[in-house]
Amino acid sequence: FVGDTMHVIHANAASGMLEHMTQYAEGAAASVVDGEGFNVGLYTSVALDSSGHQHIAYYNSSASSLVYAKQDGTSWSVEEVDNTASVGHYPSIALDGDDLPHIAYVDESSEYLKYAHYNGAGWEIAIIDDLYSNVFDTSIAINSTGHPQIAYSISNYSSSTYEYAVRYASYDGTDWSIETAMTRAGSYTSSSLDLALNGTGVPHIVYYDDYDDDLYIAVRSGGTWSTSKVRDAAG
């Protein structure tokens, strides 16, 4: 919402285009964000800047690339961020205090967690986790110092056993550190993961465990992660 106006970003199943739907009190209006190719707007993530304009990260399946779109008044500017193989799955976008975009996303071809940041002149891209694990979802937040924090869920096959985990990657301005918030063997923790930071920067990760069909929250306090069940049968 921007004021009393609802904004929805969605892929048009018939045309394959990425569209922006605006719902006013007196009616609705739709516009095309990106129509270059079919299924251009999969896995969308949206953030609003200080002027109420929308910034979108999404996967273009026609080009197998990560794309970023920015609203400027009534028009949209669209640019390809990363096109190295099949990249851009499960993107999550957040804006810093200067309204610059930060995007976490998955490189499906190499099974990497990647991060892209627009520095005002161009995109900086980095590999954050390259443990060759399947990454199912990402969620990014910017802390009070302007540094990105990323939560993501993975599966890793080792010694004939699948291990599923929720991880947390934190950037301090120089280096990335990676912690495991939750791990277990034999379960299937997949999508539906979301990260938020409280007023003191403490991360809270809500995730859905598809194995037992329950919703959990993981909180980091004093350097230690604790998890608790939020709801049974949440699926």
What does each of the following model-derived ranges do?
Residues F1-G235:
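Extracellular, repeat-based ectodomains that mediate carbohydrate processing or recognition
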